[in-house]
Structures are given as C-alpha cells and as structure tokens.
Amino acid sequence: MQDRQKAQDYRALLLADTPLIDVRAPIEFEQGAMPGAINLPLMMDDERAAVGTCYKRQGADAALALGHRLVCGDIRQQRLEAWKAAYQRFPNGYLCCARGGQRSHIVQRWLQETGIDCPLIEGGYKALRQTAIQATWQLAQKPILLIGGCTGSGKTQLVRQQPNGVDLEGLARHRGSSFGRTLNPQLSQASFENKLAVELLKINARQTLKRWVLEDEGRTIGANHLPECLRERMAQAPIAVVEDPFALRLERLREEYFIRMHHDFTHAYGDEAGWQAYSEYLHHGLFAIRRRLGLQRFAELTDTLDRALAEQLSSGSTDGHMAWLVPLLNEYYDPMYRYQLEKKAANIVFRGTWQEVANWLKAQ
C-alpha cells in the first residue's frame, strides 16, 4: 500500500491498465474518463449539484456538511459496499476523483474504517488527463505513414496487421463514413483522446518504434475529432495508397455492411428487432448524405435500398444492395476521396494492390 501510494508515475499507471475506482459524479465520468475506470460515485449528479450550489452560497464547510447529510445511512452503506466489492475485484486499483481532493480522500477514509487501504491518484483525473494529452503530443512527433485508398480497400485491416499500426476507427468506434457507426456508442471526445493516448503509449512501449502506421482519415471520425497535434502531423505524412479492383472492394463492403452488420444487429436485438435496427441503420446512412446526393438521386437510391432489403429479408441474398452501392461509390464516395487525395498527391510514396502495399510495408 505504502509503495503504491507513492507510485504516482501517471504514464506507468496508464500503461498498466490500472483499474480506477472513479468516484466522480456520472455526468463528469461521461464527459471524460480513463480506459479501465469504473464509475462508482460518491455523489450522484443531483447531489453534486446541490453541494456545488451550497458551496457558492454558504462556503466550503456548509457544502461539506450537506454532502455528509446527503450521503449517509443506507445510501452511504450501499455505496461503501460497492467500493469494497470493486477493491476486492481489483486489489491493484486506485481511487480517483476530479483532482485528488476531498471526494477520493473521503472514500479512502471510509474504506480504511472497514480495514481496506486503497491508494488514490494524486491530482485525480485531471492529472491523468494532462498526462494523456502530453503523451499524445510527444508521441505524435514520431514519423507517420498513412494508408490511403477508396472505400472498401481494406485499409483498416492493413493497419491492424502492422505492429506499429494504430486503429483510429476502432478507437473511435466508428468507420468514418455516413454508414460508419457500430453497435457500440462512441465515447466522449475526452475519453476517445484518453484511449488514443493509452494505445500510443502501449505500442510505443513494446517495440523499437520507427514510425506510426495510420489510416488516412479526415479531421473527424463520426462524432470524435482527432487531436490537432496528430492531425497536423498526418497532413504532412507520406501516403501508401491501396488500389484494389472495384469488384474486390464491393465484396469487402458487402461483408462488412450487409452481412456482418445484419448479424451484429440480430445477435444484439433478436431477429425482428435486429432486422428493424439494421434497416434503419442503412437508411440513416443514406439519409445523412441526401443533400450531397441531391434529393432526387437520394429518393431513387432509397427506393433501391428498400427493394434490396426486401430481397435480403425474403431470400437472405445481399445481391440487391449492389444496385444502390455501386452508384453510391461511383457518384459520391470515390470522387470525393480522389479529390481529397489529389490535394495530397505530393505525399504519395507508393501505390499498389492491398497485397502489394502489405509487402511494401514489410520491406520498409
């Protein structure tokens, strides 16, 4: 316990996936948390708000007294039992509040009264957050190689196969396009950045890193945006472009968006509700780009999508989806990406099929 109390090497704590018993209010946790943290609040949102109002009007002593009145009796005991259970499950864990102040110290003292010595994070979440921001800035200074290519080129798979690859879309829980959402909701911006920082630290720690391999992304991946320090470095980075046959790209997209997403939705929600969610997911993706398609073209593709869904529901075949996917690629996604890539033409260092790019990466 004493050694752990003194061991406030924040990077080491993040690298080790150290369990954190985060006693901040749920709203604070949702706004930003560290990977591996579990939220077991000392005060719920309404209790925290009441204490905050009391602090502004009557001062610190009155606010502290109100906090103890709000968290007492059965409520206090229930929360204490939850903290005890968490520590028993994660005996190498740490208590964490916003700044390592009263909340984590109060919980620590209450646990000590039951015979449990649980260390706390000095400086709290704010200190860990600052460490994550600094780590991302520092590690983003290393050389970067981008993997580019049109939709369906298998870029994400290629990045994942690299020992120095960072799957930005996986971290963001989004595949980048209007159809990119997954069944897992995206994290808050701060939580995404924290998760990215920990991933960079881990990859950097386990090898002699010459450079990062990242997918060529825009500023945003769904609702998350890339840290500006990383985005600036990516804008200057060399690019290896995957140029696979159109038919192969279609098969990848069929597998990812029509077969796998249908499976994931039905597995999560059951056949009927899963099918409805899958259908709404595809319609939402098309609806999101309706203005760029033009309303007439959007209506035409929506009708084609409806027919494709009816065919898939009745026969299980996904062939009908090609009738709207092919024009969507030809008229929207491919021209858009090629226009963006043309602006970065000076950064392109290699072009080839997926396998040729994979072989080229190995030779670097």
UniProtKB/Swiss-Prot annotation:
The Rhodanese domain, residue ranges: 14-137
Active-site residues annotated for this sequence: C97
PROSITE patterns: RHODANESE_3 (PS50206)
Gene Ontology MF term list: transferase activity, transferring alkyl or aryl (other than methyl) groups; tRNA 2-selenouridine synthase activity
Coiled-coil ranges per UniProt: none
Catalytic reactions of this protein: 5-methylaminomethyl-2-thiouridine(34) in tRNA + selenophosphate + (2E)-geranyl diphosphate + H2O + H(+) = 5-methylaminomethyl-2-selenouridine(34) in tRNA + (2E)-thiogeraniol + phosphate + diphosphate; 5-methylaminomethyl-2-thiouridine(34) in tRNA + (2E)-geranyl diphosphate = 5-methylaminomethyl-S-(2E)-geranyl-thiouridine(34) in tRNA + diphosphate; 5-methylaminomethyl-S-(2E)-geranyl-thiouridine(34) in tRNA + selenophosphate + H(+) = 5-methylaminomethyl-2-(Se-phospho)selenouridine(34) in tRNA + (2E)-thiogeraniol; 5-methylaminomethyl-2-(Se-phospho)selenouridine(34) in tRNA + H2O = 5-methylaminomethyl-2-selenouridine(34) in tRNA + phosphate
GO biological process: tRNA wobble uridine modification
Record keywords, A-Z: Selenium, Transferase
Pfam family membership, one: Rhodanese
Family stated for the protein in its record: Belongs to the SelU family.
Binding partners and assembly: Monomer.
Described purpose of this protein according to its UniProt entry: Involved in the post-transcriptional modification of the uridine at the wobble position (U34) of tRNA(Lys), tRNA(Glu) and tRNA(Gln). Catalyzes the conversion of 2-thiouridine (S2U-RNA) to 2-selenouridine (Se2U-RNA). Acts in a two-step process involving geranylation of 2-thiouridine (S2U) to S-geranyl-2-thiouridine (geS2U) and subsequent selenation of the latter derivative to 2-selenouridine (Se2U) in the tRNA chain.
NCBIfam families noted in UniProt: PRK11784.1-1, PRK11784.1-3, tRNA_sel_U_synt
Protein name: tRNA 2-selenouridine synthase
Organism for this UniProt entry: Salmonella enteritidis PT4 (strain P125109)
